[in-house]
């Protein structure tokens, strides 16, 4: 027997065909969200308050400091926040200290800084009652980048950019005349030496001594028109502030504020780390030949002779000496932009492949520590040196698509940036208030205006591109949404500008970003998913784990190192499937491995690391596809994406052929109820589980407190599907921390269960499965195999209007008793009522405008009392095409103290309607391998082809759907699924390490099936066997969210566009079918004149004709001739607006009056075609 049984959770055993043992548990899959938010609360906020403190007034007398902060208790818990449509948040209180320096007085006060949204345990936020997810953003890391490109003559030109986290960019570039230029903040370019002079290197000789003599520098000095530091400063000022009178002082302060002011310029710790790494001498001197000896300044000993070629070993020795300040120079740049001395380290080396033996100077930035978040003059000099070195052939250009140069901004950092914007706006207000307020009586509370802070947080959660309505179609969709990485958003790329290179799969994605899962369409490659084992480090770079190889024994150790993409470039990594002996040594002498994006074979002694698992390459959703290795990548992409669209079924079932990921994905998705700590289940109900905590101390077990786990019952998810949780533990069970207590939607026994296992045959049947169509047995309808539950929410508000308040009531004008049969005495539908489209859910009347009364009418009113005020019916009705059973009704009243209602609303009624949708012709189905299709026919069970034992099959798929698509995984799944069903087991075939062909065939034989997996099928209609044996097996098939009930639509009469008077478009507007230009040509070609005439007039924009037609149909008369279409009048007006005097003549050359009197005629008849449920907006009008 191939494979061994593995336990997944409490209830499920699977036969696992993996050959590689798991050395590392999968991490918590939503850690990227929770960890980042925790960092924000613990460190990020504090960092922000530290950055902004102290705020001082313009005289320096008042100083405001933020000392500490705390989060209070949320006003409403999670469930209550969802019910009340409020944000799940806690009050943020900040301790503020105000110091009055004149008197030395200190005032401390705790200030309320607004309600701060809290993250739920499952990594989401509840904003205005809706669950939202903050997607992590992939951006270019702040750093120094060097780039090369060919000009039109085929010459290589270099350019460099220093990109900060925030602040001005600094760019270097060369031109055709070999002059090096600098651009400050995207302005016009200046010779590079102008910036050096401005920094304090005033003479040409100083500059040449600093950077080393070369032709590029000489050309640049010739081009440079300045000769002193002051001239250079004025030149820069004129470029940055054209039109303003330049002075040296202004120029100094401008240059200082652009680059050296911590409030204006921020490299961030990641930028400092990357810049130090790039400008560090060690990487730049590798394989270079020294042009001067290196001497240890303390001992006078020569560490490396002139002419030494530096390799890794002697570089390490030299670095130790350099760190002890050898070869370092200090320049005193007093009286310039920065008064501090500048320390650099420089070493002369020979230019590679140069016959004349020229030298160049390599300058490093003398390691500023990680606290220096600004750029320093040493950084600028070192980056210029790197640029000149590149021109001499020393150094490397950067690949901007490499994940070493792209980093993630997760929730915490995005929030921090948003909070910083709010605080800096607040800072301005505080400064202004400081100058106005009386210093004796001022308190911190009076100075602080929290509005900008609250507004910026609200704006971020409510309308940022990265704050998204959670995709809650099923647990996998939730999980994937939380692990999504987007290159779009503020500060990122735009769809239109993103080139092919950015979207493409890069070798550095290995183990960090999934190469499969990305949307099809304009966002392809810009939105990605985190790989299964990946994690994010403190700098925001994605790391992936590797097993360390002991270089002395060449054996794999238990040590696991997480490497970023640029760290990995220094090592040789072996594949996870390399065979090892019992001591952990490689068996083969030559091992398949990766080095810097090349897949190659190297000697086993050269290995540094080994992959931890074959599935570390792919994301959680892709890892749920069995036999992924046998599918074409394009189809695997569709398979991974379509799993997210699977509708939760009424009776879910986990797959016979899984991958072992189903349990982990279900546990971490947030849809299941997971035990917070070890305990014993005391009580289980459908809506609550009670667990008594068990504490172990000194070998004894004690009972602790009681944990309550409420379960969600038949709630509406964000996507309108049914969100229901079912307990899977019993009283008395002892549960461990992290164990699943209750299944969520699309789960069965603690595993993801997106679809059902059905018996599938690959065969044609009367052409009904042409073009990927699916033929299905009626048994699947009858037995509710693919039945799903859908819940829609409708709401109606009673507001205060100018003419008086709206009223929710059963007393509605001009409505028959039968229309009110489902309403209670309040005028609200009762729970359990069955409603169809057009039925009233909430009766509501709105006051009409009262006309001015005559004196006689007023007298009569005074005598006989108030006449009933005129009201119109604005009841909430079931929209077109909806309907079902009323599941729940929620009523919120202002009088009863519901303070969450929006202004002007007195009462809010929410009605939930549930539908049970069976599978239909027209519904979309799919497997897990990108094999999708639409149901074309439901065949009676007795007509379906049947197996030799008489069992009818469930689904017929077209065999032509397999070869051209190259997703062979579905065929292997089919065979293994049938074997698993016959053996009564579940199996796991992990990605890239699953069941081999031999495993599949041996399992088939074990199940007593034919070795080729085919069987004789009999036609259910005739009882005859089909000519050939057919592949029949069990495939896991999903019902997708694209259901025909949501798409089918037909219009009778309805709303019309205000301008063109033509029917609106789309199902939501109850619109018509567009009959466009080409369709008109088709009818013209057929000569169908009358059909064409009625389409262009009555059915479209002949406003008079359509009313008369309706009237004629009602009265049973002949239909009158059509009038003039409104679009013709619009054309006339357009021509008149161009100054053309257009007249319309009849065949006798008499002018036709376009101001038709028929319209007034229609108004007099008052034919009211108003559709009660037609949506009314400014764009629409209803006849």
UniProtKB/Swiss-Prot annotation:
- What are the EC numbers? 2.7.7.6
Give UniProt keywords alphabetically. DNA-directed RNA polymerase, Nucleotidyltransferase, Transcription, Transferase
Instruction: Give the enzyme class.
Output: transferase
Name the Gene3D superfamilies for this protein. 2.40.50.100, 2.40.50.150, 3.90.1100.10, DNA-directed RNA polymerase, subunit 2, domain 6, RNA polymerase alpha subunit dimerisation domain, RNA polymerase Rpb2, domain 2
Q: Which CDD domains match?
A: RNA_pol_B_RPB2
Pfam families in the record: RNA_pol_Rpb2_1 (PF04563), RNA_pol_Rpb2_2 (PF04561), RNA_pol_Rpb2_3 (PF04565), RNA_pol_Rpb2_45 (PF10385), RNA_pol_Rpb2_6 (PF00562), RNA_pol_Rpb2_7 (PF04560)
The protein's GO terms of the molecular function aspect are: DNA binding; DNA-directed RNA polymerase activity; ribonucleoside binding
- CC per GO annotation: DNA-directed RNA polymerase complex
- By its UniProt entry, which InterPro entries does this protein fall under? DNA-dir_RNA_pol_bsu_external_1, DNA-dir_RNA_pol_su2, DNA-dir_RNAP_su2_dom, DNA-dir_RNAP_su2_hyb_sf, RNA_pol_bsu_bac, RNA_pol_bsu_CS, RNA_pol_bsu_protrusion, RNA_pol_Rpb2_2
Q: Which family does it belong to?
A: Belongs to the RNA polymerase beta chain family.
Function text: DNA-dependent RNA polymerase catalyzes the transcription of DNA into RNA using the four ribonucleoside triphosphates as substrates.
Protein name (database record) = DNA-directed RNA polymerase subunit beta
> What is the source species?
Staphylococcus saprophyticus subsp. saprophyticus (strain ATCC 15305 / DSM 20229 / NCIMB 8711 / NCTC 7292 / S-41)
């Amino acid at each position: 027997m191939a494979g061994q049984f593995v336990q997944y959770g409490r209830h499920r055993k699977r036969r696992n065909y993996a050959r590689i043992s798991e050395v590392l548990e999968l991490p918590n899959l939503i850690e990227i969200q929770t960890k980042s938010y925790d960092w924000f609360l613990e460190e990020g906020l504090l960092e922000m308050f530290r950055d902004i403190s102290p705020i001082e007034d313009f005289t320096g007398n008042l100083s405001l400091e933020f000392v500490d902060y705390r989060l209070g208790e949320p006003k409403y818990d999670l469930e209550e926040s969802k019910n009340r449509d409020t944000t799940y948040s806690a009050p943020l209180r900040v301790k503020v200290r105000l110091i009055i320096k004149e008197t030395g007085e200190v005032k401390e006060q705790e200030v309320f800084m607004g309600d701060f949204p809290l993250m739920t345990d499952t990594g989401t936020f509840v904003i205005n009652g809706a669950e939202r997810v903050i997607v992590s953003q992939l951006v270019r890391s702040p750093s120094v980048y060097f780039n090369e490109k060919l000009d039109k003559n085929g010459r290589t030109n270099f350019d460099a950019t220093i990109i900060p986290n925030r602040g001005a960019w600094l760019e270097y570039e060369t031109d055709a005349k070999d002059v090096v230029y600098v651009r400050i903040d995207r302005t016009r370019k200046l010779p590079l030496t102008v910036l050096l002079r401005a920094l304090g290197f005033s003479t040409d000789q100083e500059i040449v001594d600093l950077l080393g003599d070369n032709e590029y520098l000489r050309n640049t000095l010739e081009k440079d028109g300045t000769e002193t530091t002051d001239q250079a400063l004025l030149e820069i000022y004129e470029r940055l502030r054209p039109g303003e009178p330049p002075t040296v002082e202004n120029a100094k302060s401008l240059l200082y504020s652009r680059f050296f002011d911590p409030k204006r310029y921020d490299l961030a710790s990641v930028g400092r780390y990357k810049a130090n790494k790039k400008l560090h001498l060690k990487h730049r001197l590798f394989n270079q030949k020294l042009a001067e000896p290196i001497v240890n300044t303390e001992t006078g000993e020569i560490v490396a002779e002139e002419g030494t070629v530096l390799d890794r070993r002697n570089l390490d020795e030299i670095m130790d000496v350099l760190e002890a300040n050898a070869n370092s120079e200090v320049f005193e740049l007093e009286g310039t932009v920065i008064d501090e001395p500048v320390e650099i380290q420089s070493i002369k080396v020979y230019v590679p492949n140069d016959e004349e033996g020229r030298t160049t100077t390599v300058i490093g930035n003398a390691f500023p520590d990680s606290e220096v978040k600004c750029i320093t003059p040493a950084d600028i000099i070192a980056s210029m040196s790197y640029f000149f070195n590149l021109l001499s052939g020393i150094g490397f250009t950067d690949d901007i698509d490499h994940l070493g140069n792209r980093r993630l901004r997760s929730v915490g950092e995005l929030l921090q940036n948003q909070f910083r914007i709010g605080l800096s706006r607040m800072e301005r207000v505080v400064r202004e208030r400081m100058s106005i307020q009386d210093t004796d009586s001022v308190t911190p509370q009076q100075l602080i205006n929290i509005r900008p802070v609250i507004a910026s947080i609200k704006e971020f959660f409510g309308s940022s591109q990265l704050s998204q309505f959670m995709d809650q179609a099923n647990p996998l969709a939730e999980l994937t949404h939380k692990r999504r990485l987007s290159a779009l958003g503020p500060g990122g790329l735009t769809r239109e500008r993103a080139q092919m290179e950015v979207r493409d799969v890069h070798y550095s994605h290995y183990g960090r970003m999934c190469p499969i899962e990305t949307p099809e369409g304009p966002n392809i490659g810009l939105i990605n998913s985190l790989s299964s084992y990946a994690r994010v480090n403190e700098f925001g770079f994605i790391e992936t784990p590797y097993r360390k190889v002991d270089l002395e024994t060449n054996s794999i150790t238990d040590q696991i190192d997480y490497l970023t993409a640029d760290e990995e470039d220094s090592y040789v990594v072996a594949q996870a499937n390399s065979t090892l002996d019992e001591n952990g040594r490689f068996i083969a002498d030559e091992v398949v491995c990766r080095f810097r994006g090349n897949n190659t074979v190297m000697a086993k002694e050269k290995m540094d690391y080994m992959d931890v698992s074959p599935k570390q390459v792919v994301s959680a959703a892709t890892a749920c596809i069995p036999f992924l290795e046998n599918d074409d990548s394009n189809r695997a992409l569709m398979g991974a994406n379509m799993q997210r669209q699977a509708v939760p079924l009424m009776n879910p079932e986990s797959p016979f052929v899984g991958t072992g990921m189903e349990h982990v994905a279900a546990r971490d998705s947030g849809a299941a109820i997971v035990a917070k700590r070890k305990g014993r289940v005391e009580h289980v109900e459908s809506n609550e589980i009670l667990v008594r905590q068990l504490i172990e101390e000194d070998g004894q077990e004690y009972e602790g407190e009681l944990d309550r786990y409420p379960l969600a019952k038949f709630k509406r998810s964000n996507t309108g599907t049914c969100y229901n949780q079912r307990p899977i533990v019993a009283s008395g069970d002892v549960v461990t921390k992290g164990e699943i207590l209750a299944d969520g939607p699309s789960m069965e026994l603690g595993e993801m269960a997106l679809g059902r296992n059905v018996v599938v045959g690959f065969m044609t049947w009367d052409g009904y499965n042409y073009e990927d169509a699916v033929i299905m047995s009626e048994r699947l309808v009858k037995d509710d195999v693919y039945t799903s539950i859908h819940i829609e929410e409708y709401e109606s508000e009673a507001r205060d209007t100018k003419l008086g308040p709206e009223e929710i009531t059963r007393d509605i004008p001009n409505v028959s008793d039968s229309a009110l049969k489902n309403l209670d005495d309040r005028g609200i539908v009762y729970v359990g009522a069955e409603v169809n489209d057009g039925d009233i859910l909430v009766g509501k009347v709105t006051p009409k405008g009262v006309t001015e009364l005559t004196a006689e009418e007023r007298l009569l009113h005074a005598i006989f009392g108030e006449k009933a005020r005129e009201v119109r019916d604005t009841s909430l009705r079931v929209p077109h095409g909806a309907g079902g059973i009323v599941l729940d009704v929620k009523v919120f009243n202002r009088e009863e103290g519901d303070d969450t209602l929006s202004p002007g609303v007195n009462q809010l009624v929410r009605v939930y309607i549930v539908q049970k949708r069976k599978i239909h012709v027209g519904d979309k189905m799919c497997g897990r391998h990108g094999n999708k299709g639409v149901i074309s026919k439901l065949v009676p069970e007795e007509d379906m082809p049947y197996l030799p034992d008489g069992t009818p099959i469930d689904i017929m798929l077209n065999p032509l759907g397999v070869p051209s698509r190259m997703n062979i995984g579905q065929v292997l799944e089919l065979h293994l699924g049938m074997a698993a069903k016959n053996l009564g087991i579940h199996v796991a075939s992990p990605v890239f390490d699953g069941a081999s062909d031999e495993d599949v065939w041996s399992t088939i034989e074990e199940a007593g099936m034919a070795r080729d997996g085919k069987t004789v099928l009999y036609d259910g209609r005739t009882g005859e066997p089909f000519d050939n044996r057919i592949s029949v097996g069990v495939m896991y098939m999903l019902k997708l969210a694209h259901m025909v009930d949501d798409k089918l639509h037909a219009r009778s009469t309805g709303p019309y566009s205000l301008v063109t008077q033509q029917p609106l478009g789309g199902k939501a507007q109850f619109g018509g079918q567009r009959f466009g230009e080409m369709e008109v040509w088709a009818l013209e070609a057929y000569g169908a004149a009358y059909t064409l005439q009625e389409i262009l007039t009555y059915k479209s924009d002949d406003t008079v004709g359509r009313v008369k037609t309706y009237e004629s149909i009602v009265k049973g008369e002949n239909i009158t001739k059509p009038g003039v279409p409104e679009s013709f009048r619009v054309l006339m007006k357009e021509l008149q607006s161009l100054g053309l005097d257009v007249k319309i003549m009849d065949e006798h050359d008499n002018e036709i009056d376009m101001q038709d009197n028929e319209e007034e005629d229609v108004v007099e008849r008052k034919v009211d075609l108003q559709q009660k449920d037609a949506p009314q907006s400014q764009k629409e009008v209803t006849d």
